[in-house]
Every structure is written in C-alpha cells, then in structure tokens.
Amino acid sequence: MGAVMLQGTGSDVGKSVLVAGLCRAFVRRGLAVRPFKPQNMSNNAAVTIDGGEIGRAQALQAIACRVEPHSDMNPVLLKPQADRTSQLVVHGRVRGTLGSADFREARRPLLDEVLASYRRLREQCDIVVVEGAGSPAEINLRAGDIANMGFARAAGVPVVLVGDIDRGGVIAAVVGTRAVLDPADAAMIHGFLINKFRGDPALFEDGYRQIEALSGWRGFGVVPWLAATARLPSEDAVILERRGGPAEGRVLVACPILPRISNFDDLDPLKLEPGVELVMVPPGRPIPAEAALIVLPGSKATIADLAALRAEGWDIDIRAHHRRGRAILGLCGGYQMLGRRVADPEGIEGPPGAVDGLGLLDVETRLSPAKTLRRVEGEALDARFDGYEMHVGETDGPGRARPFARFDDGRTDGAIDPGGTVMGSYVHGLLANADLRRALLARLGIEGGGRDYAASVDAALDAIAEEIERHVDVDALVALAQAGG
C-alpha cells in the first residue's frame, strides 16, 4: 500500500510513542505494518532476530506491529561513546567510530543503504510507519540528511508533522517549521498532529484552526496526554524524585545515572512491583543508604563511567552498602565495573589503558573489538529467563566458578560472590522475566514477580492505540499512506 512518516517540530515531541500507537492502530484494522527509522541516536538498543542491533524504540514499535524486530527497521544507529564520538552501526553491525564532524560526510553514502532497508520492509507489509529524528527545522543539518526530509524525498514518503503542546509554543513551532523549510521539503508535509494535550480540547480549537490557516496544512487530530506511556519501556533515564524514605512495606532499589548509561529500561519491570520503589540517582546526590538493592546499569563507556562513578563518590556508597550485607546487581557494563580490573589495550572505548574496578567480584574484563550480539535463554537464581547479550570484551577470573546464569547451550554467564549478595551478568532483559524477578525480590525479603511485563507493555500499546483512534483521523492517515510512499 504505502508509507507515512512522522517528523517533529523538535526532539522529544513524542514521535516514538505515536509511531508505536499508530502501528498498533493499523494492526487492529487488519493491516500488516512495519516500523522504520532511517537514523537513530541512542545507547538503548535491542538484539534483532537476524542477530543485529537497533534502537529500543524501534524494537517496541515492532512489538506494536506484532512482528519480530529486524535490523532493517533501523538501518543506521549512532551510539554515543563520548561527547563528540559515536559508534556507527549499519544494518545491525558495527562499522566503526565517528566524530560528530565526520558523520556529516559519512552519512551521504548511507542513504542508499537506508533506502534498501526501507524497500525490503515495503515488500513485507501494507504500511510502513516511518519515524524521523530531531526536526526538519534544523536546516543547518539538511545537506546530506538521511533522517528526515532527505529520506522522505528520496523515498517519496508523505510526512505528518508532530508538535508538542505540553512544552508550550506549539503554534509557533508548527508554523515556524513551515516558514524555515525549503519549499520542496515543505511540500512533503501533508498535515500535522498536536501531541500531549492536557485538559479540554475545545480550549485549543481556535489555535488548531489558526495553525491550519497559517501553515496551509490540515490537522489530523489532537492527541491527549497518554497515561499508558508510563507503562512502556523508558526512552530516557527518568529521575524518579523521592520524598522521604520508601513507603511502608516497600523496598528501595537504587540505580545511579551514569553519563553513558545504556539499556536503562532493564529496570522498567520493577515499576510493576507494588513492593518496590525504584529510584534513579542523578549526579550530585548520594545513593540512598536505605536501599535494599543497588543496580549498576549498562554503559557504552565502562572505563569513563567508572571514573564518573568514583568522582560522584558512589563507589564509597556502594562499598558501604556491601558492608551492610545488602544486594548489588551489575548488568553488562555494571558487571564489568564490579570486577577487579577493566582493561582496554586496543583503545576500544578511548585511549588504551586499564583501571581498577570496584573489586566486589573476583573477575577481570578485557575489552576487544569483537561485539557479542545474541539472544539467550537459560536459568538463573533457580528461575527460567530469556534475554540478550550486547557487549564488547570478555570477563573471566576465579569468580566465574560461581556463575550467575547457565544458558541452554551449556555456556555460563556472570558471577556471584561467595556471600551471595553481589551479582553480575551480561544479560539484558533479565527483570522482564516474572519468575526471575520473583527470585531476585525474594532475596530482598519481599514477594513479587506476579505480573507479566510483556503482557503489561502489550496492554499499554492497545490503550495508546485506542486513544489515538478516538482523537486522530486514522482513516485519513491510511489514505495518505496509500496515496504516497
């Protein structure tokens, strides 16, 4: 049939959730749908059915389409490693590391690869729902663009512009985007959506009509604030504010927000647990002394994040927590930090060198160019699980004699200290498994793990689709996709 693309008046206007919601709304109409994002920048990634990696947002959108995530859904992924360098992933595989200035030139030849992925998806479905990146209004980035209008024009995909009314100034944002675009780019936009509206939509009716009059574009609807979004995997390491200690009967789980934190949505399943209070600890604050569990998350730059952790004094908090006999769980990069040493002799993450780890697990990590990407199934803490590995380097040492997990293929993963309170694993997605979550929480003295996280996410996608169906002219978007793309 065709395709439709959502672009935004800026970053964080809610494109990812709207794409997921539209994908599910189209699926509910009996259509075969695929998500697509030409270029993404994120350290939150997922392993695909073809053994590659894509942004977690596109993996969620695939779930909304009721299909397996595939590397074609996000052919170009940039994973920031430092302020001015990113790892370049193309078709799910690492191509190298680029500086921010280098990418402008490097992206030009990538358009053909992006279009090849898009065309393969087109052959599989009725509608491709495409998500842009940032905003087409960033006209300083237009030359060589593959994420927004560069892709839309090359593929002939009609565009709908998304504006975020919650942040204010949405009329200026939509009309201003129209004003700065090249006429040929502006011609690709066939209408707009207003997102994140709170209150009575009748109060914005005049503003909505003014946008139509000033831009010359039709409106496709006003989407309300979607409460069900809170039940979806996080796109950002949201700081959950604490007021006093944990509520009676609840235990506190704390996770420090590291500069290059990755796959922090590993912790989202804990939000389902009524007996758990999850707190993401921002820089400048101590890890709460009353925490029952500290989780060290994944990292795109383990050595740099380990230095940042020490600069915050969090290593002192972690050691004090350990002396109190409380639990610590390190995931991927966090697991590497818990060991005695992290070595990077080939300069994978930065200048070659090695640093001492926290020394809470008797293992050492050696980073190397080869990247491990695979889905896994196995048993840990006497519970079944599935998940995925996504890491560079290998970890070994005497502590590996007490592995955290055993995979079905016979391999082992991670380590547990002799006291059983410090645990490390390379597996992402562990806590999404209800039985394993229940086993971990039992170690903290609470009963949990009763809710199916995947079912909760699926129900949230249905709820978002229902809201979109009530407030958006979905039939008109289907017709737009059929007419173009």
UniProtKB/Swiss-Prot annotation:
It comes from the Bacteria. The active site is at C332 (nucleophile), H428. Gene3D superfamilies: 3.40.50.880, P-loop containing nucleotide triphosphate hydrolases. InterPro entries: Class_I_gatase-like, CobQ/CobB/MinD/ParA_Nub-bd_dom, CobQ_GATase1, CobQ_N, CobQ_synth, GATase_3, P-loop_NTPase. Pathway: Cofactor biosynthesis; adenosylcobalamin biosynthesis. Keywords: Cobalamin biosynthesis, Glutamine amidotransferase. GO terms for biological process: cobalamin biosynthetic process. GO terms for molecular function: ABC-type vitamin B12 transporter activity; catalytic activity. Residues 250-436 form the GATase cobBQ-type domain. It holds the Pfam family GATase_3. Belongs to the CobB/CobQ family. CobQ subfamily. PANTHER family: COBYRIC ACID SYNTHASE, DETHIOBIOTIN SYNTHETASE. HAMAP family: CobQ. Catalyzes amidations at positions B, D, E, and G on adenosylcobyrinic A,C-diamide. NH(2) groups are provided by glutamine, and one molecule of ATP is hydrogenolyzed for each amidation. NCBIfam families: cobQ (TIGR00313), PRK00784.1 (NF001989). This is Cobyric acid synthase. The gene is cobQ.
